[in-house]
UniProtKB/Swiss-Prot annotation:
InterPro entries: ATPase_NBD, GppA/Ppx_hydrolase, Ppx_GppA_N. Coiled coil: none annotated. One of its GO terms (molecular function) is pyrophosphatase activity. The lineage of its organism: Bacteria, Bacillati, Actinomycetota, Actinomycetes, Kitasatosporales. It comes from Streptomyces coelicolor (strain ATCC BAA-471 / A3(2) / M145). It comes from the Bacteria. Keywords: Hydrolase. Disulfide bonds: none annotated. Belongs to the GppA/Ppx family. This is Uncharacterized protein SCO0757.
Length: 336
């Protein structure tokens, strides 16, 4: 069976076409369209018309690409930027009406559950009790569990793009020490409850996912992507702390010349590093394994394991639900 996933993130629309033989999603083609929605949409503001037009074009291109590769209609979802927009429903309906693709939004807690599932499958059962950190553009997801799905999840408004807008976009480049301190205080305040739970649980293995963590890991000395996904990659908390100081001393243009830091993400790399380092310190994690699987693989795994009815229910709930408020901590349900 060949299927596809379209992930509308804060910066990029990503397509993954995968074969699902043997219950494992094996990518056969990937593509991306850079929209930078987070630069056009402030937290809580509607998605502007011109951004919707670009989104429609990207989703249509992704759908046509998936069809050329012989994949079934894409499982399409949007994360924090669209999810939090007051005109969320109008955006979703416009995309479906003009592309034929039923785009839905995933609550942050569901994002965490699906990403945890992907990390569990990648790391294997021998990893034992597992903690997960996932920095997106609009939110930070934290999860912990001993089984297939997490026992609890937290979805917090601590995304790298969001915090860059709120704390580091005042015209100073590099950011001032005061700006960085204020950013770190925000992260500590909003993360403390979830971090306390992670410390109490005492995970055997900790993993980090997302492009933000992958790029920070490369900056901290992890092997480059050309070595392939099966190369072990780890990042120590102490090394990430050093990276925060290094990034804070540089302008965005200078950061883009560092190993691993791409030009489109250079401006938000400092905020991402502060979030990641603070999260690791508060949770007591000395190091994390960098996991190449994340939410797209999690969506595919749930679709493979639970069937099309699961995704149909996700789409139905997305159409009914109002834009959710941030959820600081929630017990996860294995029945979702």
């Amino acid at each position: 069976m060949r299927t596809s996933v379209v992930d509308v993130g804060s910066n990029t629309v990503r397509l993954m076409v995968a074969d699902a033989e043997g219950g494992v999603p094996l990518p056969v083609h990937t593509a991306k369209w850079r929209l930078r929605l987070s630069e056009q949409v402030r937290p809580g503001d509607p998605v502007p018309e011109e951004a919707v037009e670009r989104l429609v074009g990207a989703v249509a291109d992704a759908s046509r690409t998936a069809d050329r590769w012989g994949a079934s209609g894409p499982l399409a979802f949007a994360t924090a930027v669209v999810r939090a927009a007051p005109n969320r429903r109008e955006v979703l309906r416009t995309v479906q009406a003009r592309t034929g693709v039923p785009l839905c939004t995933l609550p942050g807690e569901v994002e965490a559950e699906l990403t945890f599932l992907a990390a569990r499958r990648w790391m294997g059962w021998r990893s034992g009790p597992l903690a997960l950190l996932d920095i997106g553009g609009g939110s930070l997801e934290v999860a912990f569990g001993r089984g297939r799905l997490p026992g609890f999840v937290a979805s917090l408004p601590l995304g790298a793009a969001r915090l860059t807008h709120e704390f580091l976009a005042g015209g100073r480049d590099p950011a001032s020490p005061e700006q960085v301190k204020a950013l770190r205080r925000r992260v500590r305040h909003q993360l403390r409850d979830a971090a306390a739970r992670i410390r109490w649980e005492g995970p055997r293995t900790a993993v980090a996912t997302s492009r933000t963590f992958q790029q920070l890991g490369r900056l901290c000395g992890a092997p480059p992507g050309r070595y392939g996904p099966f190369t072990e990659r780890r990042m120590r908390c102490s090394d990430l702390g050093d990276a925060v100081g290094r990034l804070a001393a540089l302008s965005a243009a200078e950061r883009a010349r560092l190993p691993g830091i791409s030009a489109p993400r250079a401006a938000q790399s400092l905020a991402g590093a502060v979030v990641g380092h603070t999260a690791m310190k508060l949770t007591g994690l000395e190091a994390v394994a960098l996991c190449p699987w994340a939410i797209r693989e999690g969506v595919l795994l749930r679709h493979i394991e639970d069937g099309p009815a699961w995704w149909a229910e996700v789409v139905r709930r997305s159409d009914e639900a109002a834009p959710p408020a941030p959820v600081p901590l929630r017990l996860a349900s294995a029945s979702n």
